[in-house]
């Protein structure tokens, strides 16, 4: 099994994913120390360090060169300014790392005290986005979360950042996500596709070797790694054009009604109310019949937690068995609390189209499933109009939005100094 995470990570080094490596090792009864070390060598070569980020060679190719820019990564990376004012670089460490962690591991110095915990970027999963379920968010989706914050959580809004600062932070979040997902898939590939007694994820000593056998092995390692990375980056590129357009219904949406069509809206709300508690929509199972969150569904956990608990056969409530995993980076599992829709605090936005997409696509990483959309009432599921009826009902029971808080670019508590 992989050893415990060190108390500190060497200056400028990303923290290895000890948690995932240990979970994989426990699940398959294998030792992943060498693959984890090999993975760090390749990650450093391709993605650089916390203070000096780099882009893998793949990003020089035409179809990928616009996804991330090194200049943006350099603005976000590195040590923060020594004053409360934002500097020319170090934006991520100054604004985000105290919660999300320097490596995007979701475990910054203040993370354990929060509920819900800050997002862990290394899975490559984002809950609030406008793209279909299988896609990544667009950059605008990430920027929108930064500008608006997440109501009902400790995620603040950063609505005073300049366009350049926002672009830098968004690029860096995507960078951390790609890097983290690449690390996970390298480890997964080592566990399930390699003979660890004979093969290595990456042999840095083979680089530049003139020995034919070493050269052959190195080329094979590079080919495998490039294939894995390309698969990850392709989804990000494809996601930029994946946002679907939906036609508005022929009845009014809550907040847009007029005296002439108000009765149509009331009819839609009533239909939405009935659908809300129906078996087809099943909203009430989690959100309760009144929408206040008191459903009958048993406590559940997000996919980040399940990744190192239920997926490897450990209950999230079995603290004794979880201690070795928590020592390697896991935070004590928190059961999810279904949204109290009556409060009107909608993470990810409360615009009708945003709520429609959330119902249609579900929330990736959370138990909320995608709707089963059908074309006729003869089929089991929800029709397009039903989704809009649900939107109208939810908006009708929700408290009005709170006034936006004007804020400067918020500065989180400073991180502890490196040893």
Where are these regions (language model features)?
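Post-kinase regulatory C-tail/linker adjacent to protein kinase catalytic domains
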Residues: 186-198, 408-418
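Sec-dependent bacterial lipoprotein signal peptides
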Residues: 1-2
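Short Cys/His-rich "knuckle" micro-motifs
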Residues: 107-108, 294-296
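Extracytoplasmic electron-transfer domains, predominantly the class I c-type cytochrome c fold
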Residues: 17-37, 45, 112-161, 166-173, ...
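Electrostatic cytochrome c docking/interface patches
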Residues: 19-91, 207, 221-278, 292-293, ...
């Amino acid at each position: 099994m992989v050893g415990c995470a060190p108390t500190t990570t060497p200056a400028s080094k990303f923290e290895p994913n000890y948690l995932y490596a240990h979970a994989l090792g426990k699940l398959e009864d294998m030792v992943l120390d060498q693959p984890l070390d090999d993975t760090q060598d390749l990650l450093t070569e391709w993605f650089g360090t916390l203070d000096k980020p780099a882009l893998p060679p793949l990003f020089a190719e035409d179809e990928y060169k616009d996804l991330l820019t090194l200049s943006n990564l350099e603005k976000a990376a590195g040590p923060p300014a020594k004053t409360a004012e934002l500097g020319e670089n170090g934006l991520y460490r100054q604004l985000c790392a105290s919660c999300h962690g320097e490596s995007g591991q979701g475990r910054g110095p203040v993370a354990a005290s929060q509920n819900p915990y800050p997002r862990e970027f290394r899975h490559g999963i984002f809950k609030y986005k406008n793209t279909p379920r299988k896609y990544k968010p667009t950059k605008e989706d990430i920027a929108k979360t930064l500008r608006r914050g997440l109501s009902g959580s400790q995620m603040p809004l950063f609505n005073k950042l300049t366009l350049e600062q926002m672009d830098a932070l968004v690029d860096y979040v995507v960078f951390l996500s790609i890097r983290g997902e690449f690390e996970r898939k390298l480890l997964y590939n080592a566990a399930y596709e390699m003979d660890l007694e004979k093969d290595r994820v990456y042999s840095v000593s083979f680089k530049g070797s003139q020995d034919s056998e070493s050269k052959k092995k190195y080329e094979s390692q590079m080919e495998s790694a490039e294939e894995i990375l390309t698969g990850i980056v392709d989804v990000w590129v494809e996601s930029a054009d994946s946002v679907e357009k939906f036609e508005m219904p022929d009845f009014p949406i809550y907040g847009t009604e007029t005296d002439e069509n108000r009765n149509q809206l009331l009819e839609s709300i009533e239909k939405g109310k009935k659908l809300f508690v129906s078996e087809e929509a099943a909203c009430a199972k989690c959100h309760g019949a009144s929408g206040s969150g008191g459903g009958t569904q048993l406590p559940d956990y997000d996919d980040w937690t399940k990744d190192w608990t239920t997926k490897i056969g450990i209950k999230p409530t079995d603290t004794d068995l979880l201690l070795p995993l928590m020592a390697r980076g896991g935070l004590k599992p928190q059961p999810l609390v279904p949204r109290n829709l009556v409060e009107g605090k909608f993470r990810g936005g409360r615009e009708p189209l945003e709520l429609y997409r959330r119902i249609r696509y579900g929330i990736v990483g959370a138990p909320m499933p995608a709707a089963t959309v059908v074309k006729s009432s003869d089929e089991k599921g929800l029709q397009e109009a039903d989704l809009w009826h649900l939107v109208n009902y939810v908006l009708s029971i929700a408290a009005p939005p709170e006034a936006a808080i004007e804020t400067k670019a918020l500065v989180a508590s400073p991180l502890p100094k490196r040893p």
